[in-house]
Amino acid sequence: MIGDLLKGFNASFGDLLTSTEAGQGTIKDNMDDLCDILEDEILKSKASEDEKKALLKKLRTFCNTETNIMLVGATGCGKSSTINALFAVSEECKDIEEEEYLEEDQPQKTYVEIAKVGSKADPETKDIEKYRIGNLILWDTPGLGDGTEIDEHHKEVITELLRKEDEEGKALIDLVLVILDGSTKDLGTSYKILNDVIIPELKNDTSRILVALNQADIAMKTGRHWDYEKNEPDEILIQFLEEKVQSIKNRIKEDSDLDISPVYYCAGYMEESGDVVHPYNLSKLLYYIMQSLPAQKRVAIMEGINTDSDHYEYNDEEENYNEEIKDSFYDSFDYISDGVDTGVEVGGTILGIPGAIIGGFLGGFVGCIKSILDSIF
């Protein structure tokens, strides 16, 4: 299968091929080229016309599918810092009207717009901010907990967005990332939106809900217990965080009878003293996001990630999350051939025949993608 081949591919050999048409570029640049080449390989293959149609349909779905993630949380929980830590949302992002960037001749760049969700929106209340990074779309909902009336408005726009459908009549939002403030005991507002809106609207589908506890570094009020040199919690803080995560899980179970396991992390920031707290467990959070999404939805995530390798350096040691992230991405390629019953060779890869991929432009682009990912993770 393609995923296994990508994992075993010799990236350094692929780099030798980049002197032709395959440049270093970005993950998205190389993915676009790789998709074009795979399409050409399918068309040139000895597969039947029906098999070609099936493969092409899945390939185009895989390469062009948008992924929509909604972020929900109380004011001050760190939604914006999480977005900036995880994804390539730069200060150069500009406001742009939706119809402008949907024109075919407009390049797929990173844009931010104010999404007018909710016809009864009060001009004094905040609207949902919508970030587009290629095929990745992030919906940053307004912070909760600033007053009953304002929260009711926010609940309405969140509900409306959760009910939106895509062109195929499927739910628009693929994943709801609920961010909790690890520095406070008062999580009532977040529990309320989770139990009153998110869980009911998603019809108890826990695969589309991810709960994350941010600001893990300041979770304890009695001393920081944060090792600045190692950029990690000490044993006392780890135990506290594990107990807090278990408490949150128990509370959600008690309220909804659903099993949702939160992940704790720190999005990173600079203190007034100049001390830098780098992101911690960001790779773990990204891995959980990848695993929560269907295979064909993961490409957009990788195309939109923040490529600063420092963000993924510090994690707990429960798993090698960086390798798991890459494997999850490579495994997603198997979506193209899953369910297509054919025995012919397509690009030397799609049906598990690894011969042709180590030659020609295809190998170069695969090598580029692997090299880029290896430099990040």
What are these regions (language model features)?
Residues E97-Y101, D105-V112, H154-K155, H225-I236:
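Short, flexible helix-coil linker/hinge segments at the edges of structured domains or between repeats
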Residues G143-E152, P233-D234:
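Flexible beta-alpha connector loops of hexameric P-loop NTPases
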Residues G145-E149, K185-G188, M220-K221, E271-D275:
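A generic structural signal for short coil/turn motifs at secondary-structure boundaries
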Residues G73-T75, W139-L144, V178-D181, V211-R224, ...:
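Short loop/turn segments at strand-loop or loop-helix junctions that form parts
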